[in-house]
A protein has these predicted regions:
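His/Asp/Glu-rich metal-coordinating catalytic cores
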Residues: 78-175, 182-397, 415-429, 448-451
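Hard-cation-handling environments
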Residues: 309-439, 443-490, 494-610
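Intrinsically disordered, low-complexity RNA-associated tracts
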Residues: 1-97
Length: 610
């Protein structure tokens, strides 16, 4: 009956003690048992029907249960002073959460001050990072990076940002602030400083690497603009800016996030980052300082978007060591390890495991040699110089006694590893017993170059190790981005450093972490954003773009030259040679016509005849 009429009222005749038990349970009255005693209740069959029962004791069809108001009132506890006190503290804690989590309450909303932020590179792309922070009277630049050309930019080696807007405001600029020493953040510094100079503020390693670039470009005298800083100290730059560098973990040592303090409020720029809880040098990210600013109140956060799609926390650099140990332990011949030359902790671990297995270390590649030399010079890493050998000494040692650390992990045509793979390196030729370890990921666009180099290496008989666990990223995953957002707790959020889909994904993470959708803007290069305690808005667009550089002579290549080269590459060339008399300017012979990229060689004569 109950299953068939679940949720609907039924009539139950009250005839036996069994039914009495059910009725007493339904009315929540205590059941005393069936034994006869002085306290026994009268038989329910003799009860006077209540308003919900008919004369036969059946429940009326409306299904209302017998009233229990009397019992409910009897068991309801009246509020006491302590209850009211607890309720008051619940309200107070809710208000405390509101104050803690809503940055709106931490800012000076009466302030009329504002700051303008203008990215000139690094958005809609990976690389070329440069950003202008500007008040009414002064401005600073954060990073001055380069990027790499695509395959259509014939004869172009690097791209640098268009400095047109910097030329417009150069009299306002009071300094250049550097977050870290990767090429996409410092690579364009020599080209800027050949034209205009400002004080440069940064930690020692980035300044040292900028110094080597100045030396290569024959502008060594501009080292005088260096201002090394101490982390966790406020550095006054001009009158309108106070900047603090906070240690951050990344794929290059001595990286920083920065807090830019202005009259309008504090802007946190993360730089490139990941949250590595077990870094090789033990220097974890300064989360305490980020939290300090978050508690104090942050006007705007600008955060790295590169790994926005990665939902798994980024692996620790220290985790690569055991993987290298496993690979090195099985090697019977030479080991050739290639990685990014700037990843000094990766190189450090490779050298340590090479030493463990009794190998001498040969570092090949100009950028690799330079970076290791700088790191050792300033005691970022320490090795006995006796473990190193030159490239021309490699052949003097047994193969099992040699570790070669080299550039070329991206298959670059002029890199050391690529030249080894095609047999063109002067000192090192690939052998069938060699183990090649690629400890890097493919930068988007380089997959074809890497694949071609791998083909060359394997045709030479070498074994190639390209395992996933011998590389970890240097950029924050979604979970680390969430941690940054929660620690800093900004009122406004500007996702940066990545292609449009990366910053769009990061925007969603920001909304997930409590930043109102209206307080997030997706910038593009050249868009100027004005930020004040009460608002954030786009105000104008400035000229931006790319300048093409030929590394052979460090000269700029004009845009129309690149367009001509692209046209020549797609359409081909016709060359006509005509011999003309000096006396009367008449042709002395039939013209000779040669074509390139138009018809096949065997058809060239027929084409010329036509």
């Amino acid at each position: 009956m109950a299953e068939e009429n679940e949720g609907t009222p039924v009539s139950v005749p009250i005839q036996e003690n069994k039914e009495v038990k059910q009725e007493t349970k339904m009315t929540s009255e205590p059941l005393q048992g069936n034994k006869s005693n002085n306290n026994r209740r009268p038989n329910n069959n003799n009860r006077k029907p209540n308003n919900n029962q008919n004369k036969n004791g059946e429940v009326k069809p409306n299904g209302n249960k017998p009233s229990n108001n009397k019992n409910k009132n009897r068991h309801r506890r009246q509020p006491t002073p302590i209850d009211e006190n607890l309720r008051n503290f619940v309200t107070k804690n809710q208000e405390a959460h509101k104050q803690r989590l809503n940055p709106h309450y931490k800012l000076d909303l009466a302030s009329k001050e504002k700051i303008r932020i203008t990215p000139l590179g690094g958005l809609g792309e990976i690389g070329g990072n440069i950003c202008v922070f500007e008040t009414d009277n002064e401005a600073i630049l954060v990073d001055v990076g380069m990027s790499f050309p695509d395959e259509t930019m014939h004869g172009v080696d690097i791209l640098i940002p268009d400095f047109s807007y910097i030329r417009e405001i150069k009299d306002k600029i009071v300094g250049v602030v550097i977050t870290h020493a990767h090429e996409d953040h410092i690579g364009a510094m020599p080209y800027l400083y050949k034209e205009m100079q400002f004080p440069i503020f940064g930690t020692p390693l980035p300044l040292a690497m900028i110094g080597t670039k100045f030396d290569e470009h024959h502008i060594k005298e501009f080292r005088k603009y260096f201002n090394p800083i101490e982390k966790r100290q406020l550095i006054k730059i001009g009158n309108d800016f106070e900047v603090e560098w906070m240690h951050m973990t990344h794929s290059i040592i001595d990286s920083s996030s920065i807090a830019i303090n202005t009259a309008a409020g504090t802007v946190i720029h993360t730089g490139d980052f990941k949250i590595d809880y077990t870094p090789v040098d033990g220097y974890t990210a300064d989360l305490h300082r980020l939290a300090y600013y978050g508690d104090k109140g942050v006007l705007c956060l600008m955060s790295d978007s590169t790994n926005s799609y990665n939902t798994v926390p980024t692996g620790s650099e220290l985790s690569v060591g055991p993987a290298l140990d496993r690979v090195f332990s099985k090697a019977e011949g030479r080991i050739l390890l290639s990685t990014f030359s700037s990843n000094i902790h990766r190189v450090q671990q490779a050298i340590q495991y090479g030493i463990k297995y009794g190998r001498k270390v040969c570092v090949i590649g100009r950028s690799m040699e330079r970076n290791i030399e700088i790191a050792m010079q300033y005691d970022y890493v320490r090795f006995n110089k006796s473990i190193f050998i030159d490239a021309d000494e490699v052949s003097r040692y047994n193969d099992k006694e040699v570790l070669i650390v080299t550039t070329g992990s991206q298959g670059e045509a002029n890199s050391a590893l690529f030249r080894m793979s095609i047999g063109e390196h002067r000192h090192v030729k690939i052998k069938p017993t060699d183990l090649i370890v690629l400890s890097s990921r493919a930068i988007p666009g380089n997959e074809g170059s890497i694949s071609g180099m791998l083909n060359h290496l394997q045709r030479a008989g070498a074994t190639v190790s390209y395992d996933k666990d011998i590389h970890v990223s240097g950029h924050a995953s979604m979970e680390e981005q969430k941690l940054m957002l929660r620690l800093v707790n900004p009122k406004f959020f500007l996702p940066i450093h990545g292609e449009y889909n990366h910053v769009m994904k990061h925007r969603g993470t920001g909304i997930m972490c409590g930043v109102p959708e209206r307080n997030i803007l997706l910038m593009t290069d050249g868009e100027q954003i004005e930020v004040a305690p009460k608002y954030m808005r786009k105000v104008k667009t400035v000229k931006t773009g790319k300048t093409y550089i030929d590394n052979q002579n460090n000269h700029q290549i004009e845009d129309d030259i690149i367009l001509d080269r692209q046209k020549l590459a797609s359409d081909g060339v016709v060359m006509m040679i005509v011999e003309v008399s000096e006396q009367n300017s008449k042709m002395l012979d039939k013209p000779k016509v040669t074509t390139f990229g138009i018809v096949a060689d065997k058809q060239d004569k027929a084409f010329a005849k036509e």
